[in-house]
Amino acid sequence: MSYAQFQVSASTGYAIASAGMKTGESINSSGTENHYGSYGEGVNFQIRGTYFFNESFGADLSFGYLNGADQTISKVDLPTQQVDAIARARAYGASLSMVYKFTNNVYGRFGALLKIGGKTEAVVSNRADLTQTQLDQFAAAGFTLPSGSYTQTNYVEDFHGVFPLGFVAALGYKYDLNSNFSLFAEAEYYGISLKRKDSELQSFNTDLYLPDGTLAQAGLYTMDNLPAGRALKITYSDELTHAEQADPSKELAQKVPYSSFGINIGITYKFNSASKVQ
């Protein structure tokens, strides 16, 4: 007897950090606190095609989108500076897995996971009082500012990574509605990290304010006039010479966590199986 069955599924779910790594810090007048998490945390959407070779074993190809939750990079609350910087994933991925039916309702799958596109988006707000040195520099340029004047910088930066290979595993339960449709719920684990390749500013603006909040100068720095030490695009590599380390457009590479554990719910449409006795 030969057996073949094809089904398609659509699902959504939410994942939390698994073995979270440090993503940033909070600093205030009393101390410093680490923040841990994973860029794999958030809401995901998946479509999947599964082909069963027999009543137990099959192969599964899926494509998904991750709308990642905000992760704290930096949060500073000091009398002279306030920073609120978060980053979040907007990523596309694919997986190829083997599927095994333990019973007619319980199944498991495991296989390879690949991030195929997207970005990690950083959104930063930085309010910083001018130092005395900066006030003196403005005065030397003929622009006298009172003590307590400050800058407000807002920017968005997109980070891209090298395509990584990871691991996916899931255990699920399906409930048949009829001969073609079924609902399912599953617990899913992703094990993957992303090595950064480059980043690029999408927007950048710094305004200058007087102590009472009056705007003194709009667009002190912009995308066309970045401050010293700030590059429009940064490339990441495993090695840098001493000369390259002084170049703001080059930085050492780092890996960021995407591992997660989540719950998915969805619906499956099962095409009529093709089986015959010979």
Where are the regions a protein language model picked out?
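Outer-membrane beta-barrel strand-turn architecture
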Residues: S2, Y51-E55, Y100-V106, Y175-L177, ...
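Repeated loop/turn-to-beta-strand initiation elements of outer-membrane beta-barrel proteins
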Residues: F6-V8, S56-A59, N105-G108, N180-L183, ...
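Outer-membrane beta-barrel "beta-signal"
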Residues: Q7, P257-Q278
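Transmembrane beta-barrel strands of outer-membrane/channel proteins
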Residues: A10-I16, L61-Y65, F110-G118, A185-G191
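Extracellular/periplasm-exposed beta-strand and loop segments of Gram-negative cell-envelope proteins
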Residues: A17-G40, G64-G93, I116-P164, K195-S260
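Residues on the lipid-exposed face of transmembrane beta-strands in outer-membrane beta-barrel proteins
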Residues: F45-Y51, A94-Y100, F110-L114, F167-Y175, ...
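Active-site/pore-lining binding-face segments in mid-to-C-terminal subdomains
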Residues: F159, P164-S203
